[in-house]
């Protein structure tokens, strides 16, 4: 702030008055033509100030909207006298009378656009320094600047709308679950570190040196113990913690709608979850969604979309063409364990520059390149066309339904890479070509997930969801004899290409749980040390049970059309896992470390004094 502006702000402090017995009668978005003639009191922040001759106009803002107020020397000379001091983001209390705006001056884009409040008296509740960016929906401020001044960023109307919608979503979920006789029960934040899954955040114990609590990645074990306890319908809107790499739709701390039910199978859990999402969509956006949601198996999703959370709003599909090109002279096709193709109708007009950009994009997912063919009248244009025989071309036409004007993209290699590269390219093409309709919400279930997935780094099988997921009927022995073939009683709800929630029927047999731990490479002693309390609980009359958890942040991100979950979390971390506003994480004093029995091998640069 310049010295001149600082002096002005300091000078204006003399005008600041206490709130006293003034009380708001309305928010800044409530007043309409029906209130004309009424005396009101509104309070908020100055969005804009405009001097028009003798009149001073101020747009007053709170989290709900704007109201135009007018300082008129004819209506209230005393109120008008000092109005010239008002600046953007000053905090005002206004008493005045509602009157219609002059003819031709109404604003149909505002709920309060037919009226204005002419000021009879007012108070300056506080001044404000000049903000580092404009408090408007359209801002050129970088995200880092906005996060450093988050309390100002949250004043922007879009951000306020995001959090009002988030509140409505939470209230809607609570009402729905309460109607179904669920109990809202809190579970511990300080718990025990367990293997599997993402890294835990550890909290040292001051009273037990060398011992650590872990912040929960989810309330999974505790909600299962509640089922054993007889609390047969549980939910919680709960904060969870995972020490994992950040991205646009992930945070170190996040919120989920956590649900568990006893005496149920998959159908009952999924039906309950569909009803919940239908209610939330109706209560927040006024959108009716059709239930039951479509379903597809994990194998179908990976086969046709390359991902386990397909966006079905547009119809590009992947096709396995391995057999069609098995004998090809193009060696990459001939030798690859899997060759997949994606036909893009009308894509023949793509430029080489666009294709080169897509080629660079798929390299993110381990691909070496991107093969393509343009289908033109009388010819196939492509660097690989000369390697394809007439029989192979005919087989591709039959498999893909190729027509003149199409372009086909190919990927060949290991299934994991092929699916990741083409599956993500599919989404990028949908965005690039404008194939994805706005304001469309495509829900679906993905079912029959693998029970295990192979971890190349650890050279062992790990749980695909978590180690408490029940195998499908008839797959019990496969847990140890053929882990890759074992399927889980698991289900994910997907919305527009995002995993919205995931759940499963749980293991409620102590013997099956022991077998699961053994299949994951946990020896009996380690399993007892880490999960003995759970196994013991399962030996004491555990009912069949299952549940689901929805990512609250991700849900609200999708409902608000926000590009990142950081826009729907009040005080999020950056992608470097820092808080730019509070400067967390931070060093602590040597005394605090001594109290915890901790000695650092390297002293942080910002070590706190004693």
Swiss-Prot record:
Gene Ontology cellular component terms for the protein in this record: cytoplasm
Gene Ontology molecular-function annotations: aspartate-tRNA ligase activity; aspartate-tRNA(Asn) ligase activity; ATP binding; nucleic acid binding
GO biological process, one term: aspartyl-tRNA aminoacylation
Chief localization: cytoplasm
Residues binding ATP, per UniProt: 242-244, 251, 499, 551-554
Keyword Nucleotide-binding set for record: yes
Binding residue positions for L-aspartate: 196, 242, 465, 506
Annotated site residue numbers, Important for tRNA non-discrimination: 52, 104
Subcellular location per the Swiss-Prot or TrEMBL entry: Cytoplasm
Region (Aspartate): 220-223
Top-level class of the enzyme under EC nomenclature: ligase
EC number: 6.1.1.23
The keyword Amino-acid biosynthesis is assigned to this record: no
SUBUNIT field: Homodimer.
Protein family: Belongs to the class-II aminoacyl-tRNA synthetase family. Type 1 subfamily.
Record protein name field: Aspartate--tRNA(Asp/Asn) ligase
Organism: Nitratidesulfovibrio vulgaris (strain ATCC 29579 / DSM 644 / CCUG 34227 / NCIMB 8303 / VKM B-1760 / Hildenborough)
Organism placement in taxonomy: Bacteria, Pseudomonadati, Thermodesulfobacteriota, Desulfovibrionia, Desulfovibrionales
């Amino acid at each position: 702030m310049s010295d001149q502006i600082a002096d002005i702000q300091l000078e204006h402090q003399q005008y600041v008055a206490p709130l006293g017995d003034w009380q708001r009668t309305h928010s800044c978005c409530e007043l309409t033509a029906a209130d004309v003639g009424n005396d009101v009191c509104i309070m908020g922040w100055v969005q804009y100030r405009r001097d028009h001759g003798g009149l001073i106009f101020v747009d007053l803002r709170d989290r709900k909207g704007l109201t135009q107020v007018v300082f008129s020397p004819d209506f209230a000379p005393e109120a008008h006298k000092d109005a010239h001091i008002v600046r953007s983001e000053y905090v005002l209390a206004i008493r005045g009378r509602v009157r219609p705006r002059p003819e031709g001056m109404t604003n149909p884009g505002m709920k309060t656009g037919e009226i204005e409040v002419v000021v009879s008296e007012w108070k300056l509740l506080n001044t404000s320094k000049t903000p580092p960016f404009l408090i408007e929906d359209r801002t050129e401020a970088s995200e880092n600047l906005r996060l450093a001044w988050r309390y100002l960023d949250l004043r922007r109307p879009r951000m306020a709308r995001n959090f009002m919608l988030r509140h409505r979503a939470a209230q809607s979920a609570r009402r729905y679950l309460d109607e179904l006789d669920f109990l809202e029960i809190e579970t511990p934040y300080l718990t025990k570190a367990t293997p599997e899954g993402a890294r835990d955040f550890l909290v040292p114990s001051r009273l037990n040196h060398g011992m650590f609590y872990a912040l929960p990645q989810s309330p999974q074990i505790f909600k299962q113990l509640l089922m054993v306890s007889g609390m047969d319908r549980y939910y919680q809107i709960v904060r969870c913690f995972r020490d994992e790499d950040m991205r646009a739709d992930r945070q170190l701390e996040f919120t989920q709608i956590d649900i568990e039910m006893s005496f149920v199978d998959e159908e009952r859990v999924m039906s309950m979850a569909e009803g919940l999402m239908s209610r939330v969509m109706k209560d927040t956006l006024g959108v009716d969604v059709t239930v039951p949601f479509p379903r597809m198996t994990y194998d179908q999703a990976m086969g046709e979309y390359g991902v386990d959370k397909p966006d079905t709003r547009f119809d590009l599909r992947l096709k396995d063409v391995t057999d069609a090109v098995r004998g090809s002279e193009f060696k990459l096709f001939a030798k690859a364990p899997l060759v997949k193709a994606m036909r893009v109708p009308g894509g023949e007009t793509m430029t080489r520059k666009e294709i080169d950009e897509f080629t660079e994009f798929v390299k993110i997912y381990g691909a070496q390149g991107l093969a393509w063919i343009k289908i033109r009248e009388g010819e196939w244009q492509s660097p690989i066309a000369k390697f394809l025989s007439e029989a192979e071309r005919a087989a591709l036409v039959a498999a893909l339904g190729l027509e003149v004007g199409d372009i086909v993209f190919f990927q060949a290699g290991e299934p994991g890479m092929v699916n990741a590269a083409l599956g993500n390219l599919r989404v990028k093409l949908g965005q690039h070509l404008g194939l994805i309709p706005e304001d469309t919400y495509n829900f679906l279930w993905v079912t029959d997930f693998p029970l295990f997935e192979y971890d190349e780094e650890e050279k062992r099988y790990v749980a695909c969801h978590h180690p408490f997921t029940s195998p499908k009927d008839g797959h019990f022995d496969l847990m140890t004899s053929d882990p890759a073939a074992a399927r889980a009683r698991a289900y994910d709800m997907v919305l527009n290409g995002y995993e919205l929630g995931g759940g499963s029927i749980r293991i409620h047999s102590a013997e099956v749980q022991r077998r699961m731990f053994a299949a994951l490479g946990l020896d009996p002693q380690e399993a007892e040390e880490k999960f003995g309390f759970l196994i013991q609980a399962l030996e004491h009359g555990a009912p069949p049970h299952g549940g689901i958890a929805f990512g609250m942040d991700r849900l609200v991100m999708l409902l608000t059309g926000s590009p990142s979950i950081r826009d729907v979390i009040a005080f999020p971390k950056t992608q470097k896992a820092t808080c730019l506003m509070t400067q967390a994480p931070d060093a602590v004093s040597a005394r605090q470390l001594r109290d915890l029995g901790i000695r650092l091998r390297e002293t942080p640069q910002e070590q706190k004094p004693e």
